[in-house]
């Protein structure tokens, strides 16, 4: 292998918003990384269904583009 061409591969601490922490290896320059969802709290792995609030986004879309519904694309 050539010298000084490969990135520094080190252990980093991954912190989830649920409080779970684990260690992995990465080429990131930081020593810690924050994620919103991990295998300890993701619905696919836990088997629990999580309701995502999309009503606010739909209402915002309708307010922005709702007046265009009656008009034709001509």
From Swiss-Prot:
Domain of life, per the record? Answer: Bacteria
Q: What is the organism field in this record?
A: Dechloromonas aromatica (strain RCB)
- List the PANTHER family hit by this protein, alphabetically: 50S RIBOSOMAL PROTEIN L31, CHLOROPLASTIC (PTHR33280), LARGE RIBOSOMAL SUBUNIT PROTEIN BL31A (PTHR33280:SF6)
Sum up the protein's function in the record's words.
Binds the 23S rRNA.
Q: Which GO terms describe its molecular function?
A: metal ion binding; rRNA binding; structural constituent of ribosome
A single Gene Ontology biological process assigned to it is: translation
The record describes its quaternary structure and partners as:
Part of the 50S ribosomal subunit.
The cofactors named for this UniProt entry are:
Zn(2+)
Could you tell me what this protein is called? Large ribosomal subunit protein bL31
Family annotation (SUPFAM superfamilies): L28p-like (SSF143800)
**UniProt similarity note:** Belongs to the bacterial ribosomal protein bL31 family. Type A subfamily.
* Alphabetical list of NCBIfam families matching this protein: L31 (TIGR00105), PRK00019.1 (NF000612), PRK00528.1 (NF001809)
Q: How is the cofactor bound?
A: Binds 1 zinc ion per subunit.
Residue intervals passing through the bilayer: none
Gene3D superfamilies attached to this UniProt entry? Ribosomal protein L31 (4.10.830.30)
Which keywords belong to this entry?
Metal-binding, Ribonucleoprotein, Ribosomal protein, RNA-binding, rRNA-binding, Zinc
